[in-house]
Amino acid sequence: MAKQHFLVITIGAQGHINPARRLAARLIEAGGARVTLTVPILAYRRMFPSAAAELEPREEKDDGLLTYMPYSDGVEDGLDPAANPAEFKRRIAESLRCIAAGFVARGRPITCIVYALLLSMAAAVARDLGVPSVLFWIQSATSFAVNYHYFAGGYDKLFSEAAADPSFLVELPGLPAFRRKDLPTLLTGPRPEGTFYSFLHTLYGEVFETLRREVSAGEEKPRVILNTFRALEEDVVAGFEASIDMVTVGPLVPPSLIMTSPEETATNDLYEHDTSNYMEWLDGKEEGSVVYVSFGSYATLKEEEREEVKKGLSASGRPYIWAMAKGGSGDDGGGLGVKVEWCEQARVLSHRSVGCFVTHCGWNSVAEAMACGVPMVMLPQWTDQVTNAKLAEEEWGVGVRAEAVAGEELRRCLDVVMGGGEADDGGIVMRRRAKAWSEKAREAAGDGGSSARNLAAFVVGGN
């Protein structure tokens, strides 16, 4: 049997590239498949600064495990995707066809296209090529279910009612009840024509329209790879299995978090890692005493919100490390905390001194926190972050959601999570739950775990 060759395509955001790269690496490890990860040209140039300004049509880079290739989405030529979504999609589809043709010419034909969130045009390319395609859902299974019911399940009117009434409960099959504050913001917020929000809403809709057509065709169940693990969202996953092959492969976190002797691969991130001695700083702190603060690579705080976060951290009296993508490095808060521009989050979260994670609640961050057993204080901002916050607080019991970006509220939440250690301290229960979920996450992703088995089976049946 010929070796599988998966083409994994993702958009050029760090929060999308990270899980795509980890999935690609796991596919190789699970069954010896050949995997090519393709990213937009601008992201490729940032990941590989030595890449020529004028890329060759079949440019490839190898990091020792994966092969990387750039694709064109037009942004490198100044295209505004929100202003011209049709051209954005056309450029991507054309580029993917060229990539596939190049591999045929080199005797390494693509046998399956795995497309990440927002890139359903890849499914159309796969149909034209006569190869299967698989959606890679980089968010939670619950987020998948909410979006599916909105775009393809006929429940969109409930979301409109929630948008008009914050107290209205949206009840969807197999899911907890949601209020507006818990629902992905793209489904309830304003989306003026021609804006980025409208553009994203359209791309999400096309993903689920593609799935709806595949389900309706009834020839073979469409497959969706999910960055979650079975034990975490058992009922949600089971609720779709009659019509969709739900392949749980998570948590897709750095190998160091789930394996005793991992083989690390090159990071090739879009951002340069801070070279300050923050790990040495962590070494000097007591176990579980440090607050780690990061709002991801996309989420941003207004200046007044940053000041409120700083007030809350200072008022808590606990040492903290704050990763700020554009905030500078150095001492912050009179010696109580340090700021870094960009750090290796997995190393920080897994450090013995870190006892709490103040986070925007992006799914990658939630997955890494759960893998490390670190409870969270959550300040979600948009998209699925608000849904993740609800799940972490109410379903899994591993975090507290701040009601506002305010210093006193942040201090209160930190006290709840890190608490004083009394027998009735709710933080004790939360920390125990976080550790218990950490063990389940590692079990799922480790050798012989449910996610590892699913990956191996997927590689065998990839075409």
UniProtKB/Swiss-Prot annotation:
Its EC number is 2.4.1.116. GO terms for molecular function: cyanidin-3-rhamnosylglucoside 5-O-glucosyltransferase activity; quercetin 3-O-glucosyltransferase activity; quercetin 7-O-glucosyltransferase activity. InterPro entries: UDP_glucos_trans, UDP_glycos_trans_CS. GO terms for biological process: anthocyanin-containing compound biosynthetic process. It holds the Pfam family UDPGT. The active site is at 16 (proton acceptor). It comes from the Eukaryota. It catalyses: cyanidin 3-O-rutinoside + UDP-alpha-D-glucose = cyanidin 3-O-rutinoside 5-O-beta-D-glucoside + UDP + H(+). UDP-alpha-D-glucose binds at residues 345, 360, 363-365, 368, 384-385. Keywords: Glycosyltransferase, Transferase. Transmembrane segments: none annotated. PROSITE patterns: UDPGT (PS00375). Pathway: Pigment biosynthesis; anthocyanin biosynthesis. An anthocyanidin binds at residue 16. Catalyzes the transfer of the glucosyl moiety from UDP-glucose to the 5-hydroxyl group of anthocyanin. Anthocyanins are ubiquitous colored pigments that are responsible for variations in petal color. Also acts on the 3-O-rutinosides of pelargonidin, delphinidin and malvidin, but not the corresponding glucosides or 6-acylglucosides. Does not catalyze the glucosylation of the 5-hydroxy group of cyanidin 3-glucoside. Belongs to the UDP-glycosyltransferase family. PANTHER family: GLUCOSYL/GLUCURONOSYL TRANSFERASES (PTHR11926), GLYCOSYLTRANSFERASE (PTHR11926:SF1534). This is Cyanidin 3-O-rutinoside 5-O-glucosyltransferase. The lineage of its organism: Eukaryota, Viridiplantae, Streptophyta, Embryophyta, Tracheophyta.
